[in-house]
UniProtKB/Swiss-Prot annotation:
Name listed for the protein in its UniProt record: Malonate-semialdehyde dehydrogenase 2
Residues at the active site: 286
Species of provenance: Bacillus thuringiensis (strain Al Hakam)
Protein origin, superkingdom: Bacteria
Keyword Isomerase listed: no
Family affiliation: Belongs to the aldehyde dehydrogenase family. IolA subfamily.
Top-level class of the enzyme under EC nomenclature: oxidoreductase
Pathway(s) served: Polyol metabolism; myo-inositol degradation into acetyl-CoA; acetyl-CoA from myo-inositol: step 7/7
The organism's taxonomic lineage, starting at the top: Bacteria, Bacillati, Bacillota, Bacilli, Bacillales
Length: 487
């Protein structure tokens, strides 16, 4: 199958590309043009059953495959991703809409995740103590847990799947992936390259669809763990239903990330970082900067700088040269975003840059221009809700204490940033902010794959985060062996 020209996306089960049991289809759009580029099946629980059984059968041999051999397959896979990065970046742009440069960055992050997974055997090593008592020793050994289900979002169609299945299979598990029905083509290409790298049949499976596939994974007794990334309501649902069915669950949810700008901040740096963090990927990322709390003395300067830089942003098809801001994913999301902009005006915020008025918004595709509100308060919907779009809210505060207090009132707690040259302020921020990933003079403090992606509050449901040693813990279980050896 050549996914770029596929009219109907197929499922990948047991190493074969197969049609879904379901005859129901959903269109896959290029969000920059509104054109239909493929049809994706809305698969059934019957499709899930086939994939899980294939994964379970493959687990019998894959879990016994020597760890170095698993790693060598992943190293080859990593090289294939490098060799095909241009194709992958273009495919991301076509089905997701983000700029080609941002898509290239996503490909690199995905490759980094695979590199980490290829080295995971080092982290899988157990521990031993030779003398817990006279003549008695104990040791801990790690083992895979079985079939893993992964449910991934549209906004990072390569990076998030590469968070999940490479590390899971490196640890000896097998995997059933449900990619977003809005961006299924990239996932299919990832499977093709995994097969080319030598991954055995059934180790990685893909079932396309929506609610039925999610519920099928959550309910199936052979699925031992679920990794999820998506919106807060669905994350909470996945966590509750998955744990009710006695599965391990990590569910990464929504965000409302605050950036704090203090009087001593380098405003040129802060402006550059905030613009990129707020409007990159059309604001459709869980680490986007969506609220800026700024001390009153410099607020006018910062707002002026932000508007000036936002006016320079090139909006359009991500494949076009110099484009920074692409479309949001669908027309209904565009209308939802415009509804939030309307509500901000109605609730009394000052609209200093209106993304509804950009030329691209009035043409084909699902575009919303960079939008900036000033004088936002925490009673407003644009402060409270995750908009997931290029909309930035500015809150004026009197002090760092007030900025932290406001940020901590949000129910979301993925990331937070501070712009300052004060070590004392950084320390106070680090110790008192209620958020899992922090940045100092950095707009998007997303960690590398060898660290956990550690959201708090309603930004995460579970105990073990994605990536890093948390990821290895999540995808393995332990055996303790205690032995007595007497002369």
């Amino acid at each position: 199958m050549t996914v770029q020209t596929a009219q109907i996306v197929k499922n990948y089960i047991g190493g074969e590309w197969v049609e879904s049991i379901s005859t129901k289809m959903e269109a896959v759009y290029n969000p920059a043009t509104g054109e239909v580029i493929a049809q994706v099946p809305l698969s059934t629980k019957g499709d899930v059953e086939q994939a899980v059984l294939a994964a379970n059968e493959a687990f019998k041999s894959w879990s016994k495959t020597a760890v170095p051999k698993r790693a060598r397959i992943l190293f080859k896979y990593q090289q294939l991703l490098v060799d095909n990065w241009e194709e992958l970046a273009k495919l991301i742009t076509i089905e997701n809409g983000k700029s080609y440069n941002e898509a290239y960055g996503e490909v690199l992050r995905g490759i980094e995740c695979v590199e980490f997974a290829a080295g995971a055997p080092t982290l899988m090593m157990g521990k031993q103590l030779p003398d817990i008592a006279t003549g008695i020793e104990s040791g801990m050994y790690r083992y895979p847990i079985g079939v893993i289900g992964g449910i991934t979002p549209f906004n990072f169609p390569m990076m998030v799947p590469c968070w999940m299945f490479p590390l899971a299979i490196a640890c000896g598990n097998t995997f059933v992936l449900k990619p977003s029905e809005r961006t299924p083509l990239l996932a299919a290409r990832l499977a093709e390259l995994a097969e080319e790298a030598g991954l055995p049949k059934g180790v990685l499976n893909i079932v396309n669809g929506a609610h039925d596939v999610v519920n099928g994974l959550l309910e199936h007794k052979l699925v031992k763990a679920i990794s999820f990334v998506g919106s807060q309501p669905v994350a909470e649902y996945v966590y509750k239903k998955g744990t009710e069915n006695l599965k391990r669950v990590q569910a990464l949810a929504g965000a409302k990330n605050h950036s704090i700008v203090l009087n001593d901040a380098n405003l040129e740096l802060a402006t550059k970082q905030i613009i990129s963090a707020a409007f990159g990927s059309a604001g459709e990322r869980c680490m986007a900067a969506s609220v800026v709390t700024v001390e009153e003395e410099i607020a006018d300067q910062l707002v002026e700088r932000l508007v000036e830089e936002a006016n320079k942003i090139v909006i359009g098809n991500g494949l076009d040269e110099d484009v920074f801001l692409g479309p949001v994913i669908r027309d209904n999301h565009k209308e939802r975003t415009i509804g939030y902009i309307d509500s901000g005006v109605e609730q009394g915020a000052t609209l200093v840059r209106d993304g509804r008025e950009d030329t691209a918004v009035k043409g084909a595709g699902y575009f919303v221009g960079p939008t900036i509100f000033d004088h936002v308060t925490k009673e407003m919907k644009i402060w409270q809700d995750e908009i997931f779009a290029p909309v930035l809210s500015i809150v004026r505060v009197k002090s760092l204490d007030e900025a932290i207090e406001i940020a901590n009132e949000s129910r979301f707690a993925n990331g937070a940033c501070i712009y300052t040259d004060s070590g004392a302020s950084v320390r106070q921020f680090r110790e008192t902010i209620e958020s899992g990933m922090l940045g100092v003079n950095v707009g998007v403090p997303a960690p590398m794959a060898f660290f956990p992606f550690s959201g708090w509050k309603d930004s995460f449901y579970g105990d073990l985060h994605a990536n890093g040693t948390d990821g290895v813990e999540f995808y393995t279980r332990k055996k303790m062996l205690t032995s007595r050896w007497e002369k």
